[in-house]
Amino acid sequence: VFSILFIVGMVNSVNLTDGIDGLCATVSAVVCAFFAVFAFSVGDMGAATFSGAVIGGLLGFLIFNIYPAMGDTGSLFLGGAVTGLAYMLKYELIILLVGIVYFCEIMSVVLQVSYFRLTHGKRLFKMAPIHHHFEKLGFSESKIDLCAFAITAVFCIAAFFLIKY
């Protein structure tokens, strides 16, 4: 039961990340790169190949089709792909670290709704998910994408060293 809830939650959190152009694809490309390197380091060529194929598709998407956002079909596939990779490699919970942006997106929605109900209409963020909050603060989509890329890359590198050493 926990696995089913975890998978559905992760897939939906990746879907929430697809609120601005390029965000879901950028973050997912970095997460898949982590899984490709990790899979290669443990000798799982199937997972490494699948990760590489997803990265290739995402790079093509980012170059040729960044506008409009990919939609639910693409983001739900990516959620299933990154969660499936975590399960294939037997490191299910590592997705909470390497997918920190996904986790922050879904938690911002949970916190916003909870706070709104507890305070009878007050908001914790200007808008949820969190990437829309940053948009309301004046950040451009490309700046939000770049920050999410950097945060994801740092957490993926940390996760790799945490696992390997």
Regions found by a protein language model. Give the residues of each.
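Alpha-helical transmembrane segments
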Residues: 2-165
